Amino acid sequence: MTSKTVFQNAFKTFLDFAINSLPSTQGGLNITATAPGGVGQRPFTNKAGVLKLIFVSASSLYIGGLIAHKGASYLEENEIFVPTDEDDDD
């Protein structure tokens, strides 16, 4: 279906709903709309979607961890942030 026919069908459905929800009057309006065509094609499914999701998630976590590790070692090496050796567990 093209976007034009989808819009037309949606608009016809909206008009039917709006007209049917109005209180009835003596004159009355009879408007009917029928959608042309039947069932469309089956939608596209991605067969390797879960595999791609796992690959992207794992690689992103690995690269993020690597960047964090390199950043922390840089900060400690240049003495910008050095964790204290005090034991607060006493």
Curated annotation (Swiss-Prot):
InterPro entries: MCU_reg (IPR018782). The keyword Transport applies. GO terms for cellular component: mitochondrion; uniplex complex. Essential regulatory subunit of the mitochondrial calcium uniporter (mcu-1) channel, a protein that mediates calcium uptake into mitochondria. It is found in: Mitochondrion inner membrane. The keyword Transmembrane helix applies. Its main location: mitochondrion. This is Essential MCU regulator, mitochondrial. The chain crosses the membrane at residues 49-68. Belongs to the SMDT1/EMRE family. It is a single-pass membrane protein.
